[in-house]
């Protein structure tokens, strides 16, 4: 599903923009269906280009592909038109381009730029929370600060997704519902991974279970693996083993998840064998 760019207005006259430059992270569940979603600000009214030159420069910038090229174009556009209402769309596209390239650091940087322009952008909220949760480690000195940022962003995204997500005009009701469901799944996944890393295993199990249910039609190995870890810490070994097996099946060609899930499965199987010997 390819998303069209928003309808723009030049000097207050709406101008339809072709979908040729629209973006889609094809094949990537954790952002595949969303593409470059419109910001909440654009949902409220048609964004305006103040001149024909601005409108044409925006079109040229949006037609580029690749995270690096799109980011450079967005920076140049922002410098040339510091008050433009269109800049957020270029940074949003750069964010999704970097996501397609698995460049989480630059995707996060672009998400932060989007949020500075539109604090109610659900996709930027959940993508940034996802990257922040993935980055957390036990040695972080600012773990509590990072955890609170993730909580705030996920909570806000979940609060506004029904009203702030604006799909393209040709999106079907089913596509819009699927996009919103993906955002919710991402938010609960980020919350659960963060909670797992700070030792809130019950909270992690709760939120990762919601995320797993949200991705049931297309099981996500990463979510299932972290859910199994939370259940392991809660000594729910039967559930943990079932979910790590599901993670193995869903991992496909993702070698990192397969390796981690295989190690967790061996640990759980060893525990099960030890328990049977004791009995």
PLM features per residue range, with description:
Residues 59, 93, 127, 183-186, ...:
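"A position-specific structural signal for the A-helix of alpha-solenoid helical repeats
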Residues 145-162, 232-256, 262, 266:
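TPR/TPR-like (Sel1-like) alpha-helical repeat modules
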Residues 70-73, 107, 150, 204, ...:
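Single-residue signature of alpha-solenoid repeat helices
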Residues 43-46, 78-88, 116-123, 139, ...:
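Flexible helix-coil transition and linker loops at the boundaries of alpha-helical arrays
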Residues 101-106, 132-145, 181-197, 232-243, ...:
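Alpha-helical linker/edge segments of TPR/alpha-solenoid repeat scaffolds
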Residues 23-89, 276:
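N-terminal leader/linker segments that initiate helical-solenoid repeat arrays
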Residues 51-54, 88, 122, 129, ...:
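Start-of-helix signal in alpha-solenoid helical-repeat scaffolds, especially tetratricopeptide repeats
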């Amino acid at each position: 599903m390819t998303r069209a760019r928003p309808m723009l207005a030049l000097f207050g006259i709406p101008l339809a923009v072709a979908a040729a430059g629209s973006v889609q992270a094809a094949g990537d569940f954790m952002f595949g269906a969303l593409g470059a979603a419109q910001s909440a600000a654009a949902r409220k009214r048609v964004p305006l280009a103040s001149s024909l030159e601005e409108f044409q420069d925006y079109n040229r910038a949006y037609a580029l592909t690749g995270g690096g090229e799109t980011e450079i174009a967005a920076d140049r556009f922002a410098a040339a038109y510091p008050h433009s209402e269109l800049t957020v769309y270029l940074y949003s596209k750069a964010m999704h381009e970097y996501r397609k390239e698995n460049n989480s650091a630059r995707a996060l940087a672009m998400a932060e730029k989007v949020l500075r322009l539109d604090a109610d952008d659900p996709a930027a909220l959940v993508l940034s929370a996802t990257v922040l949760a993935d980055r957390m480690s036990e040695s972080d000195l600012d773990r509590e600060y990072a955890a609170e940022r993730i909580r705030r962003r996920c909570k806000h995204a979940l609060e506004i997704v029904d009203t702030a997500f604006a799909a393209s005009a040709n999106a079907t009701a089913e596509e819009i519902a699927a996009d919103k469901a993906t955002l919710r799944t991402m938010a609960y996944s980020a919350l659960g991974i963060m909670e797992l890393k700070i030792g809130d295993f019950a909270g992690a199990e709760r939120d990762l279970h919601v995320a797993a249910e949200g991705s049931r039609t297309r099981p996500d190995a990463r979510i299932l693996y972290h859910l199994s870890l939370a259940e392991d810490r809660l000594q729910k070994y039967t559930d943990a083993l079932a979910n790590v097996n599901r993670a193995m099946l869903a991992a496909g060609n993702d070698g990192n998840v397969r390796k981690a899930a295989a190690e967790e499965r061996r640990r759980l199987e060893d525990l099960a064998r030890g328990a049977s010997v004791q009995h």
